[in-house]
From Swiss-Prot:
HAMAP family: TruB_bact. This is tRNA pseudouridine synthase B. GO terms for molecular function: RNA binding; tRNA pseudouridine(55) synthase activity. Transmembrane segments: none annotated.
Length: 305
């Protein structure tokens, strides 16, 4: 008997998932996509299986704006285990070295200012970065170590929350591309004892905070109670991740031409930069960029939600 193909729903929006421990970002995405029965889905930057916390999941038209969330600043809380280093930089790796820990809270607090602001990081071998089409983590698992170029990132916030024995809890606010494992390893080396990430929780992704998230258990319960459509109440608007951008309103006439690819003028447009665009009915219709001549050029358009 031929298998009946599942007809997926055309739904759009963002679900803020509190990613559970042990899930890859893609596994979490596919689980929620199945519960929602969504046609199109994508996430906005990977969290390691060891990590939990804010993972924006984009569905339908919202996937067109996932790159802008990927580029946004992030916030984390991490537990730094001092006295050991591992081959992965976290608790899942093999211990490479064990050293005595002779530092305390005062030593850590005195050191942290060195790691605030613009810093240089060498990405870890256990990362999704690619070399000749191969992810570095696959090369690392095969025992290979390749040279990686240092990259500049910015640490906007770095505070010591707790320190007990050989463990310290840190609060970190950082730019895109920051590796918390590398940050913790570098701090450990500067302390002279080595360190790895024992726990990691993302508390912020762009404008989204942990308090706004929903758990996988809550989504599963909603699905059990009411099916796919019961999850629609957890969907945020497709432009939720762009709330810091100016909103420009177009007349019915201008919106028609803008949606057909033409740059138009708007009286409330800023002088430059990226903007959200809505039509005369206050319906979000896409994002645009204000050019030097003051016109708004369409960059990504969406279908009606």
């Amino acid at each position: 008997m031929a298998q009946v193909k599942r007809i997926r729903r055309n739904v759009s929006g963002i679900i803020l998932l509190d990613k559970p421990l042990g899930f890859t970002s893609n596994a979490a995405l596919q689980k929620v996509r199945w519960l929602l029965n969504a046609e199109k889905a994508g996430h906005t930057g990977s969290l390691d299986p060891l990590a939990t916390g804010v993972l924006p999941l984009c569905f339908g038209e919202a996937t067109k704006f996932s790159q802008y969330l990927l580029d946004s600043d992030k916030g984390y809380e991490t537990v730094m285990q001092m006295g050991q280093t591992t081959n992965t930089g976290d608790a899942e790796g093999e211990v490479l070295q064990t050293r005595d820990v002779t530092v305390g809270r005062a030593d850590i607090e005195a050191l942290l200012p060195r790691f605030r602001g613009p810093i240089s990081q060498i990405p870890p071998m256990y990362s999704a970065l690619k070399r000749d089409g191969q992810p570095l983590y696959k090369l690392a698992r095969a025992g290979e170590v390749v040279e990686r170029e240092a990259r500049s990132v910015t640490i906007n916030r770095l505070e010591l929350l707790e320190c007990e024995g050989t463990r310290a809890r840190l609060s970190v606010g950082c730019s895109k591309g920051t590796y918390i494992r590398t940050l913790v390893e570098d701090i450990g080396e500067a302390l002279g004892c080595g360190a790895y990430v024992a726990e990691l929780r993302r508390t912020q992704a762009g404008p989204f905070a942990l308090a706004q998230t929903v758990t996988l258990e809550e989504l599963e319960q909603a699905h059990a109670d009411g099916g796919n459509e019961a999850l629609d109440r957890f969907l945020m608007p497709s432009d939720s991740g762009l709330q810091d951008w100016p909103m420009v309103s177009l007349s019915e006439h201008s919106a028609f031409y803008w949606l057909h690819g033409q740059a138009v003028r708007a009286p409330d447009a800023p002088q430059f930069g990226m903007v959200r665009v809505q039509d005369h009915n206050a319906r979000f219709i896409g994002i645009g960029e204000v050019s030097e001549d003051g016109r708004i050029a369409p960059r990504r358009l969406i279908r009606s939600e």
